[in-house]
Amino acid sequence: MSVKMAVGAVTLCACVAQAWQVPSWDARITEQGAVKERIGKTWCGHVQGMCVTSNAMYFSYHNQILKTDWYGRSLAYAVTTPHGGDICYWNGRVYTGDVYVPEEKGERARARISVYDAETLQPIKRRFLDEWNGAADGITCLDGVIYLGMGRVSPPGNKCWYGKYDAETLQPIGKPFVVDHGYDSTHGSQNLATDGTYFYSGHYCEDENAKTPCFIVMDRDFKVVGRHVFGCRQGFDVVPGGKDGAVRFIYCTTINWMSPKAQPQLPVMALVQFAELKDGKIEDITRHCIFPKPLKR
């Protein structure tokens, strides 16, 4: 994911400079204004990725893309063909890294990049990555270049593939390359974001309950410079507001989304939360509920 913002004189993510503030973090979405379990007539699945701009949040689901304001009120949505992945914003467009899952048996799944108008979510273009026999998921944009998480080398493995693509033509820039994250992940880069100086990559790990450093910080040459424990596997982005060298993130997690019996004391909902990376540690700094679903079906 990438974010359209500027802090002071530093323009992040090579997007249009625009100073902005995150709306009240205490905002709580009521059931009346919340996004329901189904958008249109189609089951949308769990959140795959998210990105934000100064006036909107974008969420990628299994087969939907949703745009809301900063209070969770729906602004636009698009139905897509599964399986959706991560999402990022750049230059008036949103991009998703997907895996097309064919309905016909015998046809192989294919990685692709899809592009939508950020205002309306109308599709603009898509490109199947036929040069790559694997998945696509984590995605972000910097200086007009799409950076794409393209899966692991072997299952399980600590080496994952990344690729670079022109944001206008969607044509590849060079060949995919491998990064050794130093630990085993199960699906490669699930979510990817940048602040213009570093890339941040979130992963699923073999042992989900262990305190595995599944959040990787890389420099612009994709050299690993940090590893952290951070549960952001359903989407995150970088937002302004960090002070004294801190990097601030917004991220999304779901509760009871796929199984309402997982935590019966809680409603089915997603949480939009905030965290900061400072002095080598990531800490949750605040949270608010968004998209609570009615328990009555």
Q: What are the language-model segments listed below?
A:
Residues 44-49, 81-91, 131-141, 184-192, ...:
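Repeated scaffold domains used in trafficking and secretory/extracellular systems
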Residues 109-119, 159-168, 212-221, 264-281, ...:
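Beta-propeller blade signature
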Residues 181-217:
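Loop/turn-rich, solvent-exposed surfaces of beta-rich toroidal or solenoidal domains
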Residues 35-63, 83-86:
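Beta-strand-rich domains and repeat architectures in extracellular enzymes and scaffolds
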Residues 59-60, 103-111, 154-160, 207-212, ...:
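Short, solvent-exposed loop/turn segments at conserved positions within beta-propeller repeat blades
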Residues 72-111:
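Blade-loop segments of beta-propeller domains
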Residues 54-55, 91-92, 143-145, 196-197, ...:
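Short coil/turn segments that connect the beta-strands within blades of beta-propeller domains
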Residues 31-41, 71-79, 122-129, 171-183, ...:
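A short beta-strand motif characteristic of beta-propeller blades
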